[in-house]
Amino acid sequence: MKTQIINGVSLPNIPWQDKPADCKDVIWRYDANPIIPRDQLPTSNSIFNSAVVPYESEKGKFAGVFRVDDKCRNMELHAGFSKDGIHWDINPDRIVFEQAEKSTEEVNQWGYGYDPRVCFIEDRFWVTWCNAYGWKPTIGVAYTFDFKTFYQCENAFLPFNRNGVLFPRKINGKYVMFSRPSDSGHTPFGDMFISQSPDMKYWGEHRHVMGPLRAWESKKIGAGPIPIETSEGWLCFYHGVLESCNGFVYSFSACILDKDEPWKVKYRCAEYLLSPQKIYECVGDVQNVTFPCATLVDADTGRIAIYYGCADTCVSMAFTTVDDVVDYVKSHSSV
């Protein structure tokens, strides 16, 4: 590999398919998509925009937190496990959070939860998601050690905010999180910001990262999976939204941020890397959506498996390599 993965883990059983000979793109889809259908659970209307991580990686296992909209159309979070990263056993019961502190018992009454991300930092798995506070969207924060018991902490920010994504280690001694301040509705605007915290409770030192730039992302953007630390900087996938005559179109691309000051953009791909083109991405509860929430990365080979929600209905997977995507972002950068 030309680009080194920093603080990565070996994943010899990472889900993988070689790039098709006729593929001209830097990211290619799994040929058996979607990997999680909308009706995998008896109560599910849809399962999408979900996050997975290596879990007991020495045993080749994976775990995740899944967005499940039930048949009452409640937005819930469920835990799940897999032996291969493709076939998932999702708990039919939603996560019921225990409170990390007694002071949050009254505040953290469950309303809804969606679009989770999962990030391993130091000794535990941190979960962030769009959480209801007074039925207004903000960033919920919780942690787990085993994906069976989850401890909910203070919300990170005031409403209205979405797309809370943690960095996988402290930077300059502080936890770092992406977010996208928003409004109460289907946000018609949005820039990405970074906030910092000494303790995962009090967040400040907010820094603007970037806003919409090109036509494919001209309406709003938001952070996607957990950033990948490389020798070039932080490799970050993010989604961008075009407002067309037929509604919103959600695509995704990538950028590379400075390693020590991650609010500084070194490279930003001018083009989308994957957009809704397959039937399962274009047709569903919300048409024309590809929404990445997680990656698995093998430090030995540089292989990346990307998990993304499709049409707010199901979960699919795509592939690339660190070298391929870094080279492409650098050679097609708009900054």
UniProtKB/Swiss-Prot annotation:
Under SUPFAM superfamilies, the record lists:
Arabinanase/levansucrase/invertase
Provide details of activity as a function of temperature. Optimum temperature is 45 degrees Celsius.
Q: Which GO terms describe its biological process?
A: cell wall organization
Another remark in the UniProt entry says: Both RaMP1 (Rumal_0852) and RaMP2 catalyze the phosphorolysis of a beta-1,4-mannosidic linkage at the non-reducing end of a substrate, but acceptor specificities are clearly different.
Enzyme Commission number:
2.4.1.319
- Fetch the Pfam families from UniProt: Glyco_hydro_130
- Reaction catalyzed: [(1->4)-beta-D-mannosyl](n) + phosphate = [(1->4)-beta-D-mannosyl](n-1) + alpha-D-mannose 1-phosphate
One of the record's GO molecular function terms: glycosyltransferase activity
Q: What does this protein do?
A: Catalyzes the phosphorolysis of beta-1,4-mannooligosaccharides to mannose 1-phosphate (Man1P) and shorter mannooligosaccharides. Can also catalyze the phosphorolysis of 4-O-beta-D-mannopyranosyl-D-glucopyranose (Man-Glc), but shows higher activity toward longer mannooligosaccharides. Involved in a mannan catabolic pathway which feeds into glycolysis.
Assembly mode = Homohexamer in solution.
Superkingdom per UniProt: Bacteria
Q: Which UniProt keywords apply?
A: Carbohydrate metabolism, Cell wall biogenesis/degradation, Glycosyltransferase, Transferase
How does this protein's activity depend on the pH of its environment?
A: Optimum pH is 6.5.
Q: Which organism is it from?
A: Ruminococcus albus (strain ATCC 27210 / DSM 20455 / JCM 14654 / NCDO 2250 / 7)
- The protein's name: Beta-1,4-mannooligosaccharide phosphorylase
Q: What class of enzyme is it?
A: transferase
